[in-house]
């Protein structure tokens, strides 16, 4: 019995038709693990940064028709929410588990906060080859950093700084069949390794 990780069949919750039925599937197959990950990693971030972090599991409460295509737990230093702050995420689409750190378009003082990525441009480029960027958290697309030109990356960061709807995340994503999802130990090790790479961008 696993506590934190996800099986390939859990991702099939996103194939369930209809809002109520899909929410029921998410509640059964995915949300229990997200709550456990929320407890584990809010403690992890608190111990790593010296700031108190709170977990926020997606509720999808505003939806009335369209079922969610993704779900997540986010970590930020506010009990009230995470969207206004730089934050960490563990989440899922039907074809991927993703891990991210960055800034949404709704963030307070977004232009100033996003400049951390401008200052640490070289550090982004030096992340391992399987690290990615996400420029729209609502879409599954996450190009590999190694596949972007300097100009592509600079433009993406500038968009987050200057455009109202712009956002920027550094990310990592694996498939539902990935061996790092086979056990809690392997999954937690993967997540901790990823967040260790992200933390210097938070504290910069």
Swiss-Prot record:
Family: Belongs to the UPF0637 family.
Matching InterPro entries: UPF0637 (IPR009403), UPF0637_domain_sf (IPR053707)
Pfam families found in the cross-reference section: DUF1054 (PF06335)
Protein name in UniProt: UPF0637 protein SaurJH9_1166
């Amino acid at each position: 019995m696993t506590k934190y990780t996800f099986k390939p069949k859990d991702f099939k919750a996103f194939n369930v038709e209809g809002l109520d039925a899909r929410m029921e599937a998410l509640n059964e197959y995915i949300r229990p693990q997200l709550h456990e990950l929320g407890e584990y990693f809010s403690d992890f971030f608190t111990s790593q940064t010296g700031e108190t972090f709170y977990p926020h599991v997606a509720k999808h409460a505003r939806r009335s028709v369209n079922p969610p295509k993704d779900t997540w737990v986010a970590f930020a230093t506010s009990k009230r929410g995470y969207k206004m702050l730089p934050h960490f995420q563990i989440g899922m689409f039907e074809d991927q588990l993703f891990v991210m750190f960055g800034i949404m378009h709704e963030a307070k003082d977004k232009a100033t906060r996003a400049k951390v990525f401008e200052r640490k441009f070289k550090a982004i480029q030096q992340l391992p080859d399987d690290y990615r960027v996400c420029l729209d958290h609502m879409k599954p697309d996450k190009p590999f950093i190694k596949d972007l030109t300097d100009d592509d990356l600079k433009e993406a960061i500038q968009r987050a700084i200057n455009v109202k709807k712009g956002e920027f995340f550094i990310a990592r994503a694996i498939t539902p069949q990935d061996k790092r999802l086979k056990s809690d130990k392997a999954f937690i090790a993967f997540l901790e390794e990823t967040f260790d790479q992200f933390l210097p961008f938070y504290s910069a």
